[in-house]
Amino acid sequence: MPSTYELEPIVELTSWSVYEVPLHGAGAPWTKHFVGYAEAQGLAQVSPAILMFDPEHGVAASASHRIFQLVGECGRHPESELMWARWKELNDIQLHRDITPAFFEVISSHRSRQVA
């Protein structure tokens, strides 16, 4: 039976946001995570740590080798917010930084260059 990764190699996230957290402890570099709603699966998602981000396409590769694509505008989905709170609790995360505006700005900049 094919794995979930083979069946759904790219997870498209709507109503997305991006956060940094000290996942590996206070002294380690903070990791970036996408939070959003995967409409195709009908599920809220928190990505594993993002390793590479392509702002031109709004696509990122995660530590789990899954590909995430940020679709449409940034925002907050109620189920995603609950999933994010639960994820932080499970990973004992007390601090986080919302870096959504920076990601949105970079993506918007690339989109406007494509239109021009």
Annotate the PLM regions.
Residues M1-V59, R66-A116:
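Cysteine-centric segments in proteins
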